[in-house]
């Protein structure tokens, strides 16, 4: 996934109201940027952190700058939760995940379950449909170990239960965790932060839901799916 325009750099002053951040750009300008991330961004909002932002000249936008990357623990971390679906799609189409390769049709945001939309739907006539739910990951506490979630997510547990229903109906249910950072070689569920999600994940795996974790390679020019990493 290549950024359409060059990113600009600066230092984070603060994140607030969840969707806003104040940043001092390297050219000295003080700006307010939009933050495309509804999560806690635990460990990624320290004042003074190096940040990269995209810039839009669209006249309807209130904030021209959008936070895309934060430097944390000496590595680049993608924080835009609107990107993982695109990264996942590229990973599937490039056969990075062999078990999901070769489907004739890939559709986005299809209705399913209890008033939900599946991120990606893979279909191929005689093969089982694959319903793929994508989650963004950028939280670590232990060197090399990415974790999800970084806060309680009732919606995430609901999605797991809906994937169980998909499998029961004869299709494939898939959880795909996209790790938007360069420094992780393993993935785990953070059960201490959200025990309900951890139980839902174990229940889903026991009932046939597949799970994969993909690490990204991040630069100031692109964020690309790099390799599968083991789930612990």
Swiss-Prot record:
It comes from the Bacteria. InterPro entries: SfsA, SfsA_C, SfsA_N. It holds the Pfam family SfsA_N. Gene3D superfamilies: 2.40.50.580, 3.40.1350.60. Transmembrane segments: none annotated. One of its GO terms (molecular function) is DNA binding. Disulfide bonds: none annotated. Belongs to the SfsA family. This is Sugar fermentation stimulation protein homolog. It comes from Brucella anthropi (strain ATCC 49188 / DSM 6882 / CCUG 24695 / JCM 21032 / LMG 3331 / NBRC 15819 / NCTC 12168 / Alc 37). The gene is sfsA.
């Amino acid at each position: 996934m290549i950024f359409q325009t060059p990113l600009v750099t600066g230092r984070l002053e603060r994140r607030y109201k969840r969707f806003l951040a104040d940043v001092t750009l390297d050219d000295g300008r003080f700006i307010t940027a939009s933050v495309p991330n509804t999560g806690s961004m635990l460990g990624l909002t320290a004042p003074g952190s190096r940040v990269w932002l995209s810039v839009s000249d669209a006249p309807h936008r209130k904030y021209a700058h959008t936070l895309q990357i934060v430097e944390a623990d000496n590595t680049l971390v993608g924080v835009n939760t609107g990107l993982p679906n695109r990264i996942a799609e590229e990973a599937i189409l490039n056969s990075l995940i062999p078990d999901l390769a070769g489907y004739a049709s890939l559709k986005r945001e299809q209705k399913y379950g209890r008033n939900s939309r599946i991120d990606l739907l893979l279909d191929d006539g005689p093969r089982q449909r694959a319903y793929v739910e994508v989650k963004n990951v950028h939280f670590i506490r232990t060197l090399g170990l990415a974790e999800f979630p970084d806060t309680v997510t009732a919606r995430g547990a609901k999605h797991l239960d809906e994937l169980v229903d998909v499998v029961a109906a004869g299709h494939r249910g898939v959880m795909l965790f996209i790790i938007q950072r360069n420094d992780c070689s393993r993935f785990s569920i953070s059960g201490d932060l959200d025990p309900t999600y951890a139980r839902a994940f174990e229940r889903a795996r026991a009932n046939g839901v597949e799970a994969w974790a993909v690490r990204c390679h991040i630069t100031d020019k692109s964020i690309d799916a790099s390799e599968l990493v083991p789930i612990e």
